Amino acid sequence: MNKLVLVILVLCTTAWATAQPVIKPPKGRIAIIADGNSPDPDDLGGTAISLALLRATSLESRLVHYSHSCDLVRVNRISEAAEYERHAMMQTACDGTARRWGGFENLTFFDAKWQLDETIKDLSKAINASSAEDPLWIIEAGEPDIIGFALAASEKEKHQYVKVVTHHPANDDAGDFYTWQSILDFGVEEVRIPDQNINLKVDESEWDWAKNHSDDRMKFVWLMGKMAEVDDVVKFQKGKWDCSDAGMVLYWITGATNGGVKQGSVTQVKTILEGFLSQNNN
């Protein structure tokens, strides 16, 4: 009987540890470049979760750049009118999450396509501020072109202190002006983790806890992902709640190349966000 109890305790402890990722970010700052104006609307949920994770782990001050709508050349799979909507939706995901969760008052959320020069200048500034003790981790949550333009406009000697995190070749190979190899040719470090769609693009019922949450901050995050599910440009998000790109942020806040969570889960995201909300009531 004692052995059975011990086994149960071990299993429970293991499950708890799996759901309780250790927050141990690497040194340096983080920048996020997302699309959202491409046919796939998944960056709506990804943006909301990314910002909420950074706030929930008290790392919001280390986010030094956030830009969205980085797909600079519209493709025929999304109409001009639908793409126009996406710009507004992505700005709402950024500003709405930031205001409700707090902590991002000093950060400007750039529309990369509509504020191209300002976006490149801001990311270049972050690159130029990098050093061995304060590297810049760039989360590639969209096409690589903005990253390429910013690297080209920044100081070459700073590129050795830049790390670009990616999880899917669909982003790497989607550039209109830069290939993935051309990004690496700048001398940055490639940090590649597994496809985050595996555990973070899930049946929307797995997010019912957020939909029915008592805290409106969590409901707002859920709503951003729901907007992607009801979007009518693509069909592959129907019935899904997708925050896959936020898996790269989860990887970073849990250690990145020093043991970071490479295959994030909804349970881990939930644990972090609910832990913050329970201690920071409105």
Language model regions located:
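Sec-dependent N-terminal signal peptides
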Residues: 4-13
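Bacterial Sec-dependent signal peptides at the C-terminal "C-region" and cleavage site
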Residues: 12-22
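N-terminal acidic, glycine/proline-rich low-complexity segments
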Residues: 20-282
